[in-house]
Every structure is written in C-alpha cells, then in structure tokens.
Amino acid sequence: MTGSFWLLLSLVAVTAAQSTTEEQAKTFLEKFNHEAEDLSYQSSLASWNYNTNITDENVQKMNEARAKWSAFYEEQSRMAKTYSLEEIQNLTLKRQLKALQHSGTSALSAEKSKRLNTILNKMSTIYSTGKVLDPNTQECLALEPGLDDIMENSRDYNRRLWAWEGWRAEVGKQLRPLYEEYVVLENEMARANNYEDYGDYWRGDYEVTGAGDYDYSRDQLMKDVERTFAEIKPLYEQLHAYVRAKLMHTYPSYISPTGCLPAHLLGDMWGRFWTNLYSLTVPFEHKPSIDVTEKMENQSWDAERIFKEAEKFFVSISLPYMTQGFWDNSMLTEPGDGRKVVCHPTAWDLGKGDFRIKMCTKVTMDDFLTAHHEMGHIQYDMAYAAQPYLLRNGANEGFHEAVGEIMSLSAATPHYLKALGLLAPDFHEDNETEINFLLKQALTIVGTLPFTYMLEKWRWMVFKGEIPKQQWMEKWWEMKREIVGVVEPLPHDETYCDPACLFHVAEDYSFIRYYTRTIYQFQFHEALCKTAKHEGALFKCDISNSTEAGQRLLQMLRLGKSEPWTLALENIVGIKTMDVKPLLNYFEPLFTWLKEQNRNSFVGWSTEWTPYSDQSIKVRISLKSALGENAYEWNDNEMYLFQSSVAYAMRKYFSEARNETVLFGEDNVWVSDKKPRISFKFFVTSPNNVSDIIPRTEVENAIRLSRDRINDVFQLDDNSLEFLGIQPTLGPPYEPPVTIWLIIFGVVMGVVVIGIVVLIFTGIRNRRKKNQASSEENPYGSVDLNKGENNSGFQNIDDVQTSL
C-alpha cells in the first residue's frame, strides 16, 4: 500500500508540474504572439517598400527593421528554450515552442549575422538591378522588361545566346564571391541549429516528429524525390525527344539529333519553363490555338482584369474575396515612374490582415495562370490567419506552392476559357485539340521537373561539401547534361555562378518546394475533381463553381501548420505520401502519342556533344617529357597566358592577313573539357559579339602564323605543345637561354687562354729565328770534334733550361 501511495503521489506531482509548465508556456506564447505581430509587420512592410522601390534609403530602413525583429526573435527563442518540450502535452503549444526554439540566423554571432544580412541584400540588389549592354543599340537592357522579351519571343539563335551569356556574365560573376561566403555562413547557422548543413535545414520544413504513423524524416524526403523522379523520367524523355526534333526545324545547324538541348533555346532565361516553345512545337497547327494571349489583347484585357477574373474563380468555389487593402496596396504592374523594383511575382502576407501581390503583369496567358497561382498563396494566407503567429504557414512549403497550381489546372482548360469568352463558343474538342492542350501543359509542368530536381540536388551537394567550390560550374553543367539533357551554349569557368542567376537562388529560397508542389497539385486536383463529381479524363476537369470542392480545400487551408502535413494530405487525398500516379494519369494520352511520334527518333541524349564542338580545337601539352625536372606547374595562370597568346595570334592574323584591327582579348578565348593530363579544347568568339564564333579555319590560320611565338612562351615545341588538326611548323626545337654571366665568363676565359697560347708560341718562334741567324756564320767552325774538343754552340735546350 505504501509503495502504491508514493507512486500515486509522484504521478500527481508530475502532472501538476506539467500543468504549471504548460500554463507558463501558454502565457509566454500569448505575449510573444502579440509582440511578434507588430515587429514582424514593421519588418515585412520595410521589405515590401524596398522591393517596390530599390533605393539606398529603403535598404537602410529594411535593415534597421530586420535588426529589431531579429533581436526580438533571438531573445524570445532563448526564452522558449527554457521550456522542456517533454513537459508539454498540448500539441498546439508544443509545435509553437518547437518552432520558436529554432534560433535561425540569431544562432550566429552578431557580426556574422550582420554580414549574412548584408550578403543577402547585395545579392538581391545585384539580381534586381542587373543590366546588359546591347552592342547593337548601345542600350542597357534589364531582365524585365528587356532580356526576358528576347528569351520568350526571339528565334534568332545568336540574339538569344547574347542575352543568355550577358545575364550570366554581368550578374552571375558579381554574385560568385558573395555566394561562396553565403554558403559558409548559412551552413554555420544550420549547424548551430543542430542540422547537418543548410540543405538539411531546408529539408527540415518537411520533418514531422511525435506524430506516430504520420512522422516523416528529412532523409525520407530525399528518397521520395529520387523515387518520384525515376517514375516521371520516361515521360520527360519522350517530351525531350519530341522538342529536340521540333527545334531542329527552327535551328537546323545548332541541334544534335542525339544530343542535349542548348540551354538558351528553351523558352526563358533559365530553361525552367518551356511554355514559350509551344508555338515551335504545336502538334496540330491547323487547329484553333489554345494560347489565348492574342484574344486577351484583342479584348483589351489589363492586369486588373486578369486578377479580377482570378478572384472570381476562387469565389466560385466558396473561397473569400480579396480584401480592399489588397487592391489598394498591391503592385500589379511595373511602375511607370522610373522606380527600380523586383519584378519577380510574389505573394505577401505582411500580417495584421495585410495581403498583397507584387508582379509586373503582362497581358499573356502565362501571366493569367500566374495570377491564379499567386492569388492561391493569398487564399492560403487568409485561411490560416486565425492560427497563432508561429503556425501561420503552409503545412509544408510545397503545399503553399501547390494551392495556386490547383486553380491553374482548371483555369487552363478549354472549358473554363470558353466560359471567359477567350475561346470561341464553337471551339470543338477532339483528339488533336486535346493533344495540343496536353503538350502545352507538359511544356510548363513536365519540362520543369528535372530542372527543379537537378538544381536543388546540386545545392544540397554544395551545402554538404560534396562539390568543392573549385568545381561548382564544372559539376553544375555535368549534372545539367546528365539529368536534364541540357547543355551550355558556351563553356563557363569558375568565375561564373550560373545557379545564382535565378531569382530563387539569389534570394535564398528553398527550391525543392517547386518539385513537391507539382506532385501534390495533381494529387489535390484528382481528389477535388472527385469531390466536384467530375467524370471523364482528369485533364478535362475544371473545378470552378464547385462549392463542395472549395469547402474541402478550405478545411485543409485553415489548418496552416497546426497539424502534420502528412495528416493534412491524407485528409484530402486519402494517403500520406507523395504519389505521381495522378500526374502520370493526367498526361497518359500525351505519353502514348509521344511514343508513337518518337518511334523513329533517338530517345534520351548523349552528353558528349556541345554547340561549340565543331569550332573547337583540341590542345595537348607534355611538360614533363619536354622539360623533365624543370617542368613547371600548369595552373590557372598558365591557362590565362595561353588564352592571351591565342588572342595575340588572332590580333596579328587579322591585322596582317585581313588588314583589320580586331582587339581580341583573353576573354574571347573559351576553354572547355579540361583534363588533368593537360589537355583541353578552345574556340574563339568576336570581341564585338559573344554569339559570333570565329570559324575554326580562321583560328587555325592564326595559330600557324604565330606558332613559334606561342611555343617560345611556354618553352615547348610542336611535339610537346600540340594543336590537334594543325600541321607542325617544323620550326627548330626550343633551346633554353644561356645565363649572361656565363657568356661573359666564357669570353674572358677564352681571351686569357688565347693570350697564353700566343705568348708561348711567340717565344718559341723568336728562339728559332735567333738560332737560324747564328747558323749563317758558325763561330765554332774551327772546333775539331775528332780531337775531343767540345762544341759549345750545340747544347740541348732542355739542358740549358734545367741548368738555369
């Protein structure tokens, strides 16, 4: 009895302690929510002001507001850690405390946190204000509008190449040193928060613990992404082969029938969405176009009309109207007052019921669908606004992105477009129009999945340290070729930072959300279509006007982050994992059609071919065999010297052979395919236009003209510095120079030796002359040797010298 009594008493004490801790935690969080609302709003408002008016003054105000918010959050995070999660039974309180106990950037020292903030601001500014000088017009073109127009509409291979390279040279090279520092600091922050690296920190958004069967790990996300990509890949390969065949008609001399696709030909600056390739790839051109851009222009649509129609869609499924503040404060078009702004479309939940969208809307079907996507974010924000501050977010980042995409799937259907008067009432759907529609959808949806998967995989590997910074670009394009089937149109060395030329990378966004959202959106779409009682093919489903579907979706949206995402997913679709079957079901008719179209085509891609292969010259260098122990190290400095030497040869050739002054520089000599045993390929572009590749024959002529000079620069000859395909000059092998002091010493010693020899021979000659003169009158002629007299006139010279 006594033991039981003490056990019962202990349980009562523990329960009382837990109850006290929970009450204290509840009071703490209520106070936090109230204070966080104000400070977070001021920080978000300052950020909005900067993004819609990029000035030094606004960046200063933004930094000050962020500093206040960070200091507050750091202190609150420290206080939250005093509450033991084991003593909290209320799951809502526990989730809030767990979120707040993550210190974020406040885990860094004040100095490093400030530096990271400075880096992020600089990267944002460089991206948002980057411009490229057009050599034809001498006009500086920004990304929007300007370069994006070229990448969306131009069919000029070289014009597209100029825009593609210009953006990466002007923006990417500036971002490179900042991004290197960014990786180090973000990794340090992540490890201070008990994550392996920053990629692991990002994957933490999907982690669910303490939820039993609904638990989900960060490692599981990686496995699910790999699994689903393997299932999607056959569809992508068929789409890739079809697009390649079509692009060969537009760019016949620039596409390999078995190779990768040049990155600058894929519809936008990054090759992320292939939507703009539709006009080049439409299967049945004689059918009415399902791209309603022209109809929108003819009917005088503007940005406000686009967003009003998007609002009507949401209202038709019983979701709320936008607030008046939304219409008053949003930036739906690019300002005409000269302000510099961040044009990339984004939805903003500033707090306190202040919801806004920032977008430089153009009257196109693509922006019509983007408006639905961004307004989907706002609907999600409004739905969970009643949740505590720390739970006002999507169930995971992919959910937030998927909501708007669900609406885009319906808004793109011919059924919905006819209802808006954007397709003729007599528009007839048949097999050909359906294939046209599905191909257009696939260019946007399927075409982007490998891009997204590969980009995030590269970043995860960078953060994990699996790709050293000395190989960032090499590995980036290696993975791009292997995974995406896309090749760089010009080789990029380690001065570039091509990934950071995308908004989401420069602005520090996790990117895997755009992969997971695509899987989720089709799972959601299939489930909501069933709720809407749709019958027939999934790709024909339009849930507009279905209040039942809207209410089912709204129930999930209101949860925010208060429940595990695995549970929220199960509530909608019936399972708690990512499943690609709905996506594959949606595109099944297209997949079948593509396989038939590609019957006689190569499906897949070789990674060996590049657009510049035909104009490249291979070089092999043998330092050891030529110089032995005196061989020097081949490094970046030597490569720079090589490029400069080729530039010199090009200048000389154009001057002497063509009577032209062309100022080639080392940056006009492009090097690729570098191997450790010192071999590489190179080609040359015009200094006036990077898209103008100098014909290989011209470069070969220039090399022949200056071959001896190039050999001398590297202390090599034609055998140890080989330009494959260029005949040897048959010039004499290189002879190393002699040191000057050795020459002087040799001359002096030679003079001394010659002087000594001259003196010796002069002495001998004089003696002989003297002896010859004496024999003409012999003073000893009277001496009679027979009588034993000594002839003193005849003595051996050696005897005379010895006696001396």
Curated annotation (Swiss-Prot):
Essential for cleavage by TMPRSS11D and TMPRSS2, as annotated region: 696-715
Cofactor (UniProt): Zn(2+); chloride
Residues modified to Phosphoserine: S782
Region named Essential for cleavage by ADAM17: 651-658
GO biological process: proteolysis
Membrane topology: Single-pass type I membrane protein
Key word Transport present: no
Reaction catalysed by this enzyme: angiotensin II + H2O = angiotensin-(1-7) + L-phenylalanine; angiotensin I + H2O = angiotensin-(1-9) + L-leucine; bradykinin(1-8) + H2O = bradykinin(1-7) + L-phenylalanine; neurotensin + H2O = neurotensin-(1-12) + L-leucine
Extracellular side: 18-739
Protein name as it appears in the record: Angiotensin-converting enzyme 2
